[in-house]
């Protein structure tokens, strides 16, 4: 298994609407297209949204993302996700134990 640690800096005043968008649309659609969401957090200042999503292999990332981003559900969201996010950091991480 391979995971992505994703850290989004959310635009000021938009965290509540981001969380609603994430939980009502983004998370279910990721999971529908085979991208597992392991956990999500908000930092103490409520400026960063941190989440982990997982794939079976590194090779699955590109294929699963292409399927997700071209889905009718994601297309219908338009630029809503991008309007919330000021900065994105993505790190590929692997478990240290089986």
Locations of regions flagged by a protein language model:
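Absolute protein N-terminus
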Residues: 1-2, 98
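Short, structured motif recognition centered on aromatic/hydrophobic residues
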Residues: 2-6, 18, 29-30, 49-52
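Short beta-strand-to-loop capping motifs
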Residues: 8-10, 53-57
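Hydrophobic small-molecule pocket/channel-lining residues, especially in calycin-type beta-barrels
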Residues: 11, 26, 72-77
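Short amphipathic alpha-helical segments
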Residues: 14-38
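Short amphipathic alpha-helices within nucleic acid-binding modules
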Residues: 16-18, 57-68
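Residues within well-ordered alpha-helical secondary structure of globular protein domains
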Residues: 21-24, 67-70, 80-83
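Glycine-rich beta-strand-turn "strand-cap" elements at beta-sheet edges
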Residues: 33-50, 56, 73-98
């Amino acid at each position: 298994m391979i995971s992505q640690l994703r850290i989004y800096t959310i635009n000021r005043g938009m965290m509540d609407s981001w969380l609603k968008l994430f939980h009502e649309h983004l998370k279910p659609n990721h999971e529908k297209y085979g991208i597992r969401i392991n956990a999500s957090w908000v930092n103490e200042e409520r400026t960063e949204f941190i989440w982990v999503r997982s794939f079976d292999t590194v090779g699955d990332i590109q294929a699963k993302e292409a399927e997700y981003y071209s889905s009718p559900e994601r297309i219908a969201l338009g630029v809503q996700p991008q309007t919330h996010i000021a900065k994105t950091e993505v790190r590929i991480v692997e478990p240290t134990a089986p």
